[in-house]
Amino acid sequence: DVCSSDLNVYGPQENHKGKMASMVFHMYNQWLAEKKVKLFDAYGDYGAGEQTRDFIYVKDVVKVNFFFWDHPEISGVFNCGTGHAHTFNTLAKGVLKHFGSGELEYVPFPEVLKGKYQSYTQADASKLLAAGYDGGFTDVDEAVAEYCAVLDKTGGYYTHEA
């Protein structure tokens, strides 16, 4: 049996998640509503928008799951992440690039999150790679562009045409 801990998944089919949907989803919708994307200002050791996450595209999560399906002899608990952290600025710039315009605005870091917020997360993907996964991961800029295109075309859902 395999249990995977999926880290910061983004991509099509997440509309139902509401406030828990990915940053890309929220940035895209912020741009539609306000023609700008808002990120947290500097906090602690991290500059404005420089907080990071190990963002993984939903297509890559599917590839990892198929890898385990194809290898029933493998068992254990695995992190399903890329092993590389990217900044929120990276995602925001990808969304703004998609639209060809817009503003990146930094908002004060919320008092309620101070001392509780993780400014850096990154998966340890070494166990996944040691198990033999070699399917790679989609470049974050490419994935953000693809996801924004799906949001444009279908509102965020894959269809036979998308």
Task: Label each region the model flagged.
Residues 9-11, 61:
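Conserved sequence/active-site signature of Rossmann-fold short-chain dehydrogenase/reductase
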Residues 31-162:
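C-terminal substrate-binding subdomain of Rossmann-fold SDR/epimerase-dehydratase oxidoreductases
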Residues 14-19, 116-119:
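Short, solvent-exposed loop/turn segments at secondary-structure boundaries
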Residues 1-4:
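Short, small-residue-biased leader/transition segments that mark boundaries at the very start
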Residues 8-9, 55:
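PG/GG-rich flexible active-site loop of Rossmann-like NAD(P)H-dependent oxidoreductases
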Residues 12-15, 127:
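Short beta-loop-alpha junction of Rossmann-like oxidoreductase domains
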